[in-house]
């Protein structure tokens, strides 16, 4: 017997309830986004490595340590995408989608990072990304946050906290960076190994440390908010005013900096305490310089990404996936002569009642075993077809979830009965 081949560590199969929760989440998100005028875009999983080095930043943890990068047969360096925004920006530039027009786009799919797998953090994970191009005013920032809040409401998710901050302009952030480096240089002995490395590469990320021993040091650090340019201050105040008008509660977090270099001004995260250390389920912000940085014309842009696996965990832990995944009708067949008419009847139901899910018993089995399968499937009705029923062109209708008598129905009346029993009662 050959040795069993398993999935790669940190890359998981989704099936059963997980797969259903995945579909439910994506379908709900798509319905909300379409209410706000968004359109879908499909993006490649593999991009040129240069794209991520230019956009995310060469000295970020993602580019330095976490990307799956390889050379193809032509010697080109390619990378499995670690996030979706850079690829979406590349597509917008390449296809001229943002030329003198506003684009509101969303996408979903797998991302890849070589991290240490743990609950809520995987090497292959799925994201739902939302991006807007061509709007500079702060009202679109507020609308995106309101959109995410609307999605949580639609899903029934509670206990999510919105944290917001402003990173200001690139010039203001550079000036603040120098101030921050000087502060941490004075307290270098208190920095952990990771922060010492970031001090020379990406010092703002020190503010995002999860090391409890550095909490007091970080809290006492100079605040970026005190060094913002006037335009960014006004932008931030207007954002808060919009959120107040919309009734979206928020917490100001001066240490919220995000792990990607391309953000400016608005940044935000939705966090929960229900998932342990990996508490961020949605994060985003404004990235007005990224389109130009990747080779396009200057274009304001803002967006966010949701971690699908983390949101799935919240939905399943709180039993919020309500839609039934099993069939409505289970077809029980007795005898070889019932297989062909059973198949025809099943197709007639699907053709006339497309919202009704029909599962036909295949592979034989006794009446008893078939009824066990029907009951286990969650079906509300079992249609029973034996040789006598075939000869009489009738079918027995057995109600599995109601105290009702079994009845015999002519084939030509079956669709009408099912429509009344199932469709009108849904």
UniProtKB/Swiss-Prot annotation:
Give the first-level EC class, as a single word. Answer: ligase
- What Gene3D superfamilies does UniProt report for this protein, alphabetically? Anticodon-binding domain, Bira Bifunctional Protein, Domain 2
Q: Quick one: which gene encodes this?
A: hisS
Q: Where in the cell is it found?
A: Cytoplasm
- Entry GO terms, CC: cytoplasm
- Gene Ontology terms for molecular function: ATP binding; histidine-tRNA ligase activity
Q: How does it assemble?
A: Homodimer.
Q: Which family does it belong to?
A: Belongs to the class-II aminoacyl-tRNA synthetase family.
Q: Which reaction does it catalyse?
A: tRNA(His) + L-histidine + ATP = L-histidyl-tRNA(His) + AMP + diphosphate + H(+)
Name under which the protein is recorded: Histidine--tRNA ligase
Keyword set, alphabetical order: Aminoacyl-tRNA synthetase, ATP-binding, Cytoplasm, Ligase, Nucleotide-binding, Protein biosynthesis
Q: What is its EC number?
A: 6.1.1.21
Species source reads Hydrogenovibrio crunogenus (strain DSM 25203 / XCL-2) (Thiomicrospira crunogena)
The record's listing under Pfam families reads:
HGTP_anticodon, tRNA-synt_His
Asked if Nucleotide-binding is a keyword of the record, the answer is yes
A Gene Ontology biological process in which this protein takes part is: histidyl-tRNA aminoacylation
Q: What is its main location?
A: cytoplasm
Superkingdom classification of source: Bacteria
């Amino acid at each position: 017997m050959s040795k069993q081949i398993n999935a790669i560590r940190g890359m998981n199969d989704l099936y059963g309830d997980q797969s259903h929760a995945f579909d439910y989440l994506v379908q709900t998100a798509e319905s909300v986004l379409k209410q706000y005028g968004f359109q879908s875009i499909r993006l490649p999983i593999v991009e040129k490595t240069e794209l991520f080095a230019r956009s995310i930043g060469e000295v970020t943890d993602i580019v330095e340590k976490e990307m799956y990068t390889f050379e193809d047969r032509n010697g080109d360096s390619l990378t499995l995408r670690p996030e979706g925004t850079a690829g979406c920006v590349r597509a917008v530039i390449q296809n001229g989608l943002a030329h003198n027009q506003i684009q509101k786009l969303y996408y979903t799919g797998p991302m890849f990072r070589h991290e240490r797998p743990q609950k809520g953090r995987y090497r292959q994970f799925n994201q739902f990304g939302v991006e807007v191009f061509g709007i500079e005013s702060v009202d679109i920032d507020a609308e995106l946050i309101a959109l995410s809040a609307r999605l949580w409401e639609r899903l029934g998710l509670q206990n999510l906290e919105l944290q917001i901050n402003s990173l200001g302009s690139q010039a203001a952030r550079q000036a603040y960076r120098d101030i921050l480096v000087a502060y941490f240089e004075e307290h270098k002995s208190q920095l952990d190994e990771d922060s010492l490395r970031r001090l020379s590469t990406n010092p703002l990320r020190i503010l995002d440390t999860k090391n409890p021993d550095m909490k007091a040091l970080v809290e006492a650090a100079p605040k970026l908010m005190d060094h913002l340019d006037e335009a960014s201050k006004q932008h931030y105040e207007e954002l808060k005013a919009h959120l107040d008008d919309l009734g979206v509660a928020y917490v100001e977090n001066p240490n919220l900096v995000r792990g990607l270099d391309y953000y400016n001004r608005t940044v935000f995260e939705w966090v929960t305490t229900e998932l342990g250390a990996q508490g961020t389920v949605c994060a985003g912000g404004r990235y007005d310089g990224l389109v130009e940085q990747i080779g396009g014309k200057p274009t304001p842009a803002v967006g966010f990404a949701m971690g699908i696996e983390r949101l799935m965990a919240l939905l399943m832990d709180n039993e919020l996936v309500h839609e039934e995944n099993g069939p409505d009708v289970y077809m029980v067949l007795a005898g070889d002569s019932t297989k062909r008419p059973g198949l025809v009847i099943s197709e007639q139901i699907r053709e006339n009642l497309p919202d009704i899910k029909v599962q036909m018993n295949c592979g034989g089995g006794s009446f008893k075993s078939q009824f066990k399968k029907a009951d286990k499937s969650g079906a509300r009705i079992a249609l029973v077809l034996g040789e006598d029923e075939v000869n009489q062109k009738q079918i027995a209708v057995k109600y599995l979830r109601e105290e009702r008598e079994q009845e015999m129905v002519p084939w030509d009346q079956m669709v009408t009965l099912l429509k009344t029993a199932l469709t009108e009662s849904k």
